[in-house]
Amino acid sequence: MKTAATFSALQDLDADLLIFPFSSEGLKKAASPVLEAAGLSDAPLDDFKAAAGDTLVLYPRPGKLRAPRVMLVGTGEAGSLDDWHRAATAAASRAVDLEARRIVFDLPAAGGKAKPGIEAVAETLVEGCLFGAYRFERLKSGKLDKGEKKTAAKGKAKKAEKGIDLLTLRVPASALAAAEKGMASGLVIGSAQEMARNLVNLPGNHLQAEDIARAAAASGKQYGYGVTVLRKKEIESLRMGGLVAVNQGSLNPPTFTVMDYVPKKKAKATIALVGKGVTFDSGGISIKPSEGMGDMKSDMAGAAAVIGAVEAAARLALPVRIIGLIPATDNMPDGNAQKPGDVITTYSGITVEVGNTDAEGRLILADALTYAAQKYSPDAIIDLATLTGACIVALGYQVAGLFSNDDALAGAIEGAARDTGEKVWRLPLWELYDEQIKSDVADVSNTGSRGAGTITAAKFLEKFIDGHKKWAHIDIAGPSFPAKGAAKVNGGSGFGVRLLVELLRKWS
């Protein structure tokens, strides 16, 4: 998708769709001039309440506008950045359905309601349009599509990829530079989120640990940051017992990918981001029920978010050093797979009783967290993981669970969540939960007694941060791959990319 900003008159804009955002506050007063310019009455406003994400498509009278359609889209009463993102997502999704490839967002229609500022709104609109226009159809052959034209060369169905080719923002002339700046950063962040979504949506037979490593390496090569990939022999020599144990049942070797973005000027801080990279989680010997197992291709969403965040940070040239760490494997049942009751030794030297092989994510994260703390001594460690179904039970599909041993870090993450709309809710790390993960035969168990499953998982991870004083764990099990109808998107959402980038920008 290309972007542009303009201050041309409405009548001069050549587009497939003109989009007018309106607040629910003072709707009729703001919308009437737009409808008049399109040769329409106020009557359609009876069907449009302008709640965030509401849309209404109308058809101008001939000769009034060059665009064949206009759309009213609601930004709610508050007009927050989250509301603007919802508006852009809904508008872009509807535009794709209408096959409108050139769209214009008219910000003056908002009547000065772009409260967060033109630059921030422009950035959010681009991110939202990329989000709403996204379709994952790369694995469709098109052979069963009806009515498609055949190519002369191969006689196969030829279908244009769905999407938006050009997004233009119409702004006042005085705001042109701010709009262009915001659109540029929005394109970077939105594209990084889209890349993460593509990775999450790939099925297990198309994405293995090696493919995650290749994706990180390709990003590093293109955007100028270092990537090192440790493979099975190196992982074994480092005695990363958690990653090795989870991989035992797999035919595909594990990888441990290290991304290292170093700014050109002296870094203001060093932040370690750790992403869980389980490319498919069958549960191992403690096998999952068949219902919904196909969605376990998304168990590497934390890894995808970390790759996206590091990529965006590099492209935005943030003045913070970022270490991205991704332990990756699938979790499969096999004669050689780890078994319930096994005791393994992690990279830290801490021994773990495997109470359940389906609690595998915390085992590979244990190695990565200790590695991050000991090798890099970062100013903060943040891990993202689709760790527990218990987090979905507690918070649903639109909110991630947040745990931290540092109030300032937790507050910064909560602030970034408010700014981006990628919602988090902090849960406790009280010592009393340690009782639930005690083991009689090892230092700790990877499963807890009944109840508080998302908390006991976080308490397990806490034991592997090597005493680090500034650590946060974000359980993204719900929002990374929402159930159908549970959120504004189906499939992989790329949750965490925008959250992390906003956090890193504020850090700098």
UniProtKB/Swiss-Prot annotation:
<keyword id="KW-0464">Manganese</keyword>
<dbReference type="GO" id="GO:0006508">
    <property type="term" value="P:proteolysis"/>
</dbReference>
<comment type="function">
    <text>Presumably involved in the processing and regular turnover of intracellular proteins. Catalyzes the removal of unsubstituted N-terminal amino acids from various peptides.</text>
</comment>
<dbReference type="InterPro" id="IPR043472">
    <property type="entry name" value="Macro_dom-like"/>
</dbReference>
<feature type="active site">
    <location>
        <position position="362"/>
    </location>
</feature>
<keyword id="KW-0031">Aminopeptidase</keyword>
<dbReference type="GO" id="GO:0070006">
    <property type="term" value="F:metalloaminopeptidase activity"/>
</dbReference>
<feature type="binding site">
    <location>
        <position position="281"/>
    </location>
    <ligand>
        <name>Mn(2+) 1</name>
    </ligand>
</feature>
<feature type="binding site">
    <location>
        <position position="276"/>
    </location>
    <ligand>
        <name>Mn(2+) 2</name>
    </ligand>
</feature>
<dbReference type="Pfam" id="PF02789">
    <property type="entry name" value="Peptidase_M17_N"/>
</dbReference>
<feature type="binding site">
    <location>
        <position position="360"/>
    </location>
    <ligand>
        <name>Mn(2+) 1</name>
    </ligand>
</feature>
<dbReference type="InterPro" id="IPR000819">
    <property type="entry name" value="Peptidase_M17_C"/>
</dbReference>
<dbReference type="InterPro" id="IPR011356">
    <property type="entry name" value="Leucine_aapep/pepB"/>
</dbReference>
<feature type="binding site">
    <location>
        <position position="360"/>
    </location>
    <ligand>
        <name>Mn(2+) 2</name>
    </ligand>
</feature>
<feature type="binding site">
    <location>
        <position position="281"/>
    </location>
    <ligand>
        <name>Mn(2+) 2</name>
    </ligand>
</feature>
<dbReference type="InterPro" id="IPR008283">
    <property type="entry name" value="Peptidase_M17_N"/>
</dbReference>
<dbReference type="Pfam" id="PF00883">
    <property type="entry name" value="Peptidase_M17"/>
</dbReference>
<keyword id="KW-0963">Cytoplasm</keyword>
<protein>
    <recommendedName>
        <fullName>Probable cytosol aminopeptidase</fullName>
        <ecNumber>3.4.11.1</ecNumber>
        <ecNumber>3.4.11.10</ecNumber>
    </recommendedName>
</protein>
<keyword id="KW-0479">Metal-binding</keyword>
<keyword id="KW-0645">Protease</keyword>
<keyword id="KW-0378">Hydrolase</keyword>
<dbReference type="GO" id="GO:0005737">
    <property type="term" value="C:cytoplasm"/>
</dbReference>
<dbReference type="InterPro" id="IPR023042">
    <property type="entry name" value="Peptidase_M17_leu_NH2_pept"/>
</dbReference>
<comment type="similarity">
    <text>Belongs to the peptidase M17 family.</text>
</comment>
<feature type="active site">
    <location>
        <position position="288"/>
    </location>
</feature>
<feature type="binding site">
    <location>
        <position position="299"/>
    </location>
    <ligand>
        <name>Mn(2+) 2</name>
    </ligand>
</feature>
<dbReference type="GO" id="GO:0030145">
    <property type="term" value="F:manganese ion binding"/>
</dbReference>
<feature type="binding site">
    <location>
        <position position="358"/>
    </location>
    <ligand>
        <name>Mn(2+) 1</name>
    </ligand>
</feature>
